[in-house]
Amino acid sequence: MKLFIYTSILINVINAQIALPTFQGAHKAHSSVSSSGSQTFSYTGSQQTFAVPSGVTTITIKMWGAQGGSGGYWSNSSYCGTGGKGGYSTGNLSVTAGSTVYVYVGGKGESHSSCSERMRQSNPLQGGWNGGGDGDYSYSGGGGGGASDIRYNGTSIGDRVIVAGGGGGHGNAGSSTLLSDGGAGGGLVAETKANNTQYGNRTPGAGATQSSGNSNGVGSTGTANLTGGGGGGYYGGGAGANSTGGGGGSGYIGGVSSGSTITGNASMPDPDGGTMIGREGDGLIVISW
C-alpha cells in the first residue's frame, strides 16, 4: 500500500515538472522579399516583358535609344556620313510585385551597304523598329533610329513612362562634310543639325521636344531627295529638305522618379562601364531592383 502511494506521488511530481509541448497550428510563412538583381534587354524587333519579382516595389531603369542609319554619297567619294546617335534616360518606377513591365528596345536605322558611290534605292532605307522614320526613296538617306521605352499598366503609346530617343538618319551626302549627318536623339530637346549651306542653306529635320514633333512617337519619313528619316522618341523627329539629316526623337522621364535624360551628342553612362558620347547601333535597356 505504501509503495503504491509513493509511486503515485513520484509520477505526479515528474508530470508537473515536465512541460509538454502544445501545438496551436502551423506557423504562417513570412512574405518573401526578392534579392537584388538586374536584367538586360537587347534589341529583338518585338515587345519584351519583365515580370516584377515577389517583394519588389521599385525598379531602376537605364535605357539607350538606337542610332540612325547612314545614307549613300552623291559624288562618288569615300566620305561616309553617320546617323545621329541614340540618347539615354534613367529613372525609378514604382511597381507591384507580380505585375508585368513592357519593354521596347529600339533598332538602328537601315544604312546603305556602301557610301563610296552614288546609289539609287528601289525601296527606302527603313527606319529602326519602334519609331524610326524611313529615308527618302530615290537616292535614299538613312533610316531614323528607333526609340527605347518602358510601358506600364498597358501597351499603348500613352502607357510609356520613360523613353530614350533614337537618332535621325543621315542624308545622302553631297561632299565630305558633316552637313548631312542626322541629329542625336534623346534629351528633353533632341538635336537639330545645322543647315546644309552647300545647297542653298537647306534646313534639316527638326529635333523633337516634349511638345513638338510627331506625337505618335514615330520619326518623319524623308520625302525630299537625299533626306534621312527622323528618329523615334516621345515625340518623333522631323525630316528636312534635300540632302539633310533627320532630327532626333526626344526622350521622356515624366512617368518615373529621380529621372534624367541625355541627348546622344553628350556624355552618358556606357552600359559596359565608364562613359561614352551617345549610343551607337541598336538600343538597350537594363532593369535592376
Regions found by a protein language model. Name each.
Residues G83-R202:
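Secretome/extracellular-domain signature
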